């Protein structure tokens, strides 16, 4: 049972992968995946060793054919000769026979339910009678059980790895593109594992959409509990991208689950060198797990809240905050910031700027300001903020919107009476608890349970230097992920006791909102990290496409190394660029292929031309 308000690890069955354990009482493991050709032993070993030296505890390699699967023996032998015992994981798609071979040489084999025995997707609805559907499940069992027997004989672990982008037409036809369909795709395999008493199983459910990823994993946890299954989970956001956006997107999804105690191993998938993923994953794990043993947070879940299928908490709109409005962003001016000279990104200007005890002399046209209540004079576009101990003064100040800072544990009768009497008040939820998520959740559920519809802005305070900006971004994204996906967030206010620029804090807040699918402020790139299947220069291609499309706010562009997830993830993108073979690229509009096998040297130009022409038609 998940405790919304207090951090503790979910109890998962122990699984042995080579010399390390996943689940049970083992720490959360971090891993990455090579991008080299799996037939190139020297290149794979060199890259695997870089991953291991960075702190990676498992290394995954693509094994698209029998040759690649057999070469795992050579890669494994060379790593052992070099003194490394790190387990290798074979990544198998489209060919169940390859999984049989890989199980002989890898410590773990990942199979994808979407393409293990089901034919390649053509995105067509197929009508099955119940009897025909049962026959398909029998075919799956007949093929999967021999593989499990090989794994049992060789002490090889199995990962059932479902990707939102590669669901089979069979699952899509019966369940649609839904969390229920994704979960059922996994459960079909788990039921066979349980029937065969094969317990050396790890599960993953991934998507590039953080909301789908988190909600689907929550549903899977619920379904497994109902079936008395306790397999460990591997977490990741597929095609997260690169740079700050990729890190923030990963932290929103992975962090939301880790914060609820879910996850036994993680991978942060970045379109960068694989060893660059490890420090990011390690920081996320360390940041969340240090909450263990925190002071108990007393909280009661609101009766209308659903952890598995959350909807936005009902609130009354105050100005542009709450109701059906997108969440707002509030920025604080630092001691050395001049309100008139601070420059914000034009598409990421804060909705409100907090100025402390005095307003700037020359204010920006149309900009809204927040000022301490005892300095508030009622000037246009200015709003007062009250600390929780100034609740008695709220009624004496006239303003269309007022802000009240609250923390769980404040005298509830006093603040509830104030909020009931003053619906114009926006709550600013703060916490200095080690488990700030639990405390901020508990406060918001308390409001909800007592019929209070005041919007809630979550204020998060950090202490980082400018050199640690990436750490702040990961922590803020992890802290806000669950609050946003739970439907509790009406605004974000990031503050920092350090020299990180206010513009960087504001940009981070907007990036977190976009990663959680709550507010769009820039072009979004759904790009995979690449693997041995990728046959073009992924990183330079991403850079070219970004340079040409960064101004296209609101557009989602998929950049995928191969067809494993490519066409499926295109359903979540407006346009796509997908590897189609050596030196060849196919272009997509959503999941419809519009140009096939374009020479790589011409493909970016073709994509940009197609986007331009298509947008003109609209």
Positions of PLM-derived features:
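N-terminal amphipathic alpha-helix/helix-capping segment at the start of soluble metabolic enzymes
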Residues: 1-32, 148-154, 290-339, 547
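Short, acidic/polar
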Residues: 38-50, 94-99, 250-254, 337-345, ...
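Active-site beta->alpha loop and helix N-cap motifs at the rims of alpha/beta catalytic domains
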Residues: 3, 56-188, 319-320, 328-438
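Extended, intrinsically disordered, low-complexity segments
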Residues: 2, 282-332, 356, 370-395, ...
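Catalytic alpha/beta core domains of metabolic enzymes, predominantly
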Residues: 127-144, 149, 171-321, 401, ...
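Glycine-rich phosphate-binding active-site loops on the catalytic face of alpha/beta enzymes
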Residues: 57-60, 106-122, 259-275, 482, ...
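A structural motif
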Residues: 53-58, 106, 198, 262-263, ...
């Amino acid at each position: 049972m998940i405790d919304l308000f207090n951090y503790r690890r979910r109890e998962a069955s122990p699984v042995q992968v080579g010399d390390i354990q996943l689940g049970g009482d083992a720490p959360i493991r971090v891993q990455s995946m090579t991008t080299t050709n799996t037939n190139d032993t020297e290149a794979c070993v060199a890259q695997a060793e870089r991953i291991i030296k960075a702190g990676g505890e498992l290394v995954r390699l693509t094994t698209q054919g029998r040759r690649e699967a057999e070469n795992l023996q050579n890669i494994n032998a060379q790593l052992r000769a070099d003194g490394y015992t790190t387990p290798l994981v074979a990544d198998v798609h489209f060919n169940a026979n390859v999984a049989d071979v890989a199980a002989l040489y890898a410590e773990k084999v990942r199979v994808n339910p979407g393409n293990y025995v089901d034919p390649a997707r053509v995105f067509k609805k197929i009508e099955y009678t119940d009897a025909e559907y049962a026959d398909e499940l029998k075919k799956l069992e007949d093929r999967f059980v021999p593989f499990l027997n090989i794994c049992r004989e060789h002490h090889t672990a199995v990962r059932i790895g479902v990707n939102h982008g590669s669901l089979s037409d069979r699952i899509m036809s019966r369940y649609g593109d839904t969390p229920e369909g994704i979960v059922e795709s996994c459960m079909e395999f788990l039921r066979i594992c349980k029937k065969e008493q094969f317990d050396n199983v790890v599960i993953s459910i991934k998507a590039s959409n953080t909301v789908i990823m988190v909600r689907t994993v929550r549903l899977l946890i619920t379904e497994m509990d109902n079936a008395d299954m306790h397999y460990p989970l591997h977490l990741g956001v597929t095609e997260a991208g690169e740079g700050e956006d990729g890190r923030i997107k990963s932290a929103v999804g992975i962090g939301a689950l880790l914060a609820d105690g879910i996850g036994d191993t993680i991978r942060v998938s970045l379109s960068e060198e694989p060893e660059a993923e490890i420090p990011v994953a390690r920081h996320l794990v360390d940041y969340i797990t240090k909450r263990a043993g925190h002071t108990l947070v007393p909280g009661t879940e609101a009766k209308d809240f659903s952890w598995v299928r959350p909807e936005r908490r009902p609130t009354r709109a105050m100005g542009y905050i709450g109701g059906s409005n997108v969440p707002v962003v509030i920025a604080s001016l630092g001691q050395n910031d001049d309100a008139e000279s601070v420059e914000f990104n034009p598409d990421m200007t804060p909705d409100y700027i907090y100025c402390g005890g005095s307003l700037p002399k020359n204010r920006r046209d149309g900009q809204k300001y927040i000022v301490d209540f005892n300095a508030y004079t009622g000037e246009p576009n200015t709003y007062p903020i009250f600390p929780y101990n100034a609740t008695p003064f709220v009624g004496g100040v006239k303003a269309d919107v007022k802000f009240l800072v609250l923390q769980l544990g404040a005298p509830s009768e006093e603040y509830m009476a104030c909020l009931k009497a003053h619906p114009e008040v926006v709550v600013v939820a703060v916490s200095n608890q080690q488990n700030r998520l639990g405390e901020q959740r508990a406060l918001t559920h308390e409001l909800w349970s007592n019929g209070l519809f005041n919007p809630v802005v979550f204020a998060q305070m950090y202490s980082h230097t400018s050199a640690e900006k990436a750490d702040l971004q990961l922590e803020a994204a992890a802290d806000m992920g669950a609050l946003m996906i739970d439907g509790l967030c009406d605004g974000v206010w990031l503050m920092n006791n350090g020299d990180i620029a206010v513009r960087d804090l504001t940009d981070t807040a907007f990036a977190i909102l976009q990663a959680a699918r709550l507010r769009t402020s820039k072009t979004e790139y759904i790009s995979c990290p690449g693997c041995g299947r990728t046959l073009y220069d992924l990183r330079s291609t991403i850079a070219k496409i970004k340079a040409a499309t960064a101004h296209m706010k609101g557009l989602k562009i998929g950049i995928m190394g191969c067809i494993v997830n490519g066409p499926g993830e295109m359903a979540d993108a407006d346009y796509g660029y997908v590897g189609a073979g050596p030196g060849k690229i196919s272009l997509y509009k959503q999941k419809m292929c519009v140009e096939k096998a374009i020479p790589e040297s011409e493909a970016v130009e073709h994509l940009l031309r197609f986007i331009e022409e298509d947008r003109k038609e609209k």
